[in-house]
UniProtKB/Swiss-Prot annotation:
Part of the 30S ribosomal subunit. Contacts proteins S8 and S17. May interact with IF1 in the 30S initiation complex. Belongs to the universal ribosomal protein uS12 family. One of its GO terms (biological process) is translation. This is Small ribosomal subunit protein uS12. Pfam families: Ribosom_S12_S23. HAMAP family: Ribosomal_uS12_B. One of its GO terms (cellular component) is small ribosomal subunit. It comes from the Bacteria. The modification 3-methylthioaspartic acid is found at D89.
Amino acid sequence: MPTINQLVRKGRSPKVAKTKAPALKNNPMRRGVCTRVYTTTPKKPNSALRKVARVRLAGGIEVTAYIPGVGHNLQEHSIVLVRGGRVKDLPGVRYKIVRGSLDTQGVKNRKQARSKYGAKMEKK
């Protein structure tokens, strides 16, 4: 516990909040180029083959980004839009690829939550 005199001399330093997506540099989204597209397995107790991509962002930073939805058309040198948002069962994956923008196609035959997966409204 500081004395009044110590507080007068130094004051209290404000707590600095650490960002959860540092590679985006305070932007909501960032453009990048896929350097590698592959699958990984989640940590226990889950079991699957999660689709992820290694992306070199516009600032030159390389991040691992998750590809959401069923099926994708991404390959090496695809230009993608990356947003923040971690995948809980994949350690080190703190970013997601935005579906339906740039080279990424939206999810086919998607009826619900379409805006999250870049799916257009189905024609009647």
